Amino acid sequence: MDNRGSSQKGSLLLLLLLVSNLFLCKSVASLPICPSGAVNCQVSLRDLFDRAVILSHYIHNLSSEMFNEFDKRYAQGRGFITKAINSCHTSSLSTPEDKEQAQQIHHEVLLNLILRVLRSWNDPLYHLVTEVRGMQEAPDAILSRAIEIEEQNKRLLEGMEKIVGQVHPGIKENEVYSVWSGLPSLQMADEDTRLFAFYNLLHCLRRDSHKIDNYLKLLKCRIIYDSNC
């Protein structure tokens, strides 16, 4: 890895350390969130958004690095990219494709859409980690990122639930998500089929993490700064 890549990764890790346990109701010496003995811990909406944006950006960077590593090691010359277009399990969720489309959507709808996308990745991320562990000579650069993304996706989902609870208190959101049925493909005996299944899943993860990152930045600007940013 070149110096620029090492520096970027170091910066991202530092940001993550700064917001470790960022959505947990704990009192931290440098950032006292809850008074001693508090029962219902509340983090400010601005802090929640700040931390969610940092975390979503971290997840997107990890997913991009993991996809690029897999592409370099396993996908060269196989023509996978032409088959991967519009074949994500989350395609059933109607998500805006760019910032202009997202700006036309009410923030309540966009918040719930983020929740649905994050929930749609719980199952595939769990199985991704399991199946990568089972790969012969699985590269640590891929496995370590898969493990980290699975953990941070759960943390981001928890944070988003807190954000929705503050923006729309009292509203119970149905746990709607897009079901993933790609496990058999990750376990196929045919190498080309199996590698494409991994490639496609990582391609979709990179795509969706980028969307969530953009949606959160837009929502933070709209809700926290009244679109004045």
From Swiss-Prot:
InterPro entries xref list: 4_helix_cytokine-like_core, Somatotropin/Prolactin, Somatotropin_CS
CDD domains recorded: prolactin_like (cd10288)
Single biological process term from Gene Ontology: lactation
GO molecular function, one term: hormone activity
Entry's localization field: Secreted
Gene3D superfamilies: 1.20.1250.10
UniProt-listed PROSITE patterns: SOMATOTROPIN_1 (PS00266), SOMATOTROPIN_2 (PS00338)
Modified residues (Phosphoserine): 56, 64, 120
Record keywords, A-Z: Disulfide bond, Glycoprotein, Hormone, Lactation, Phosphoprotein, Secreted, Signal
Cystine crosslinks: 34-41, 88-204, 221-229
Glycan-bearing residues: 61
Signal peptide per UniProt: 1-30
A GO cellular component entry from the record: extracellular space
Residues in coiled coil: none
Assembly notes: Interacts with PRLR.
Family statement drawn from the similarity comment of this UniProt entry: Belongs to the somatotropin/prolactin family.
Described function: Prolactin acts primarily on the mammary gland by promoting lactation.
Protein name, entry field: Prolactin
Lineage: Eukaryota, Metazoa, Chordata, Craniata, Vertebrata
Gene this protein is translated from: PRL
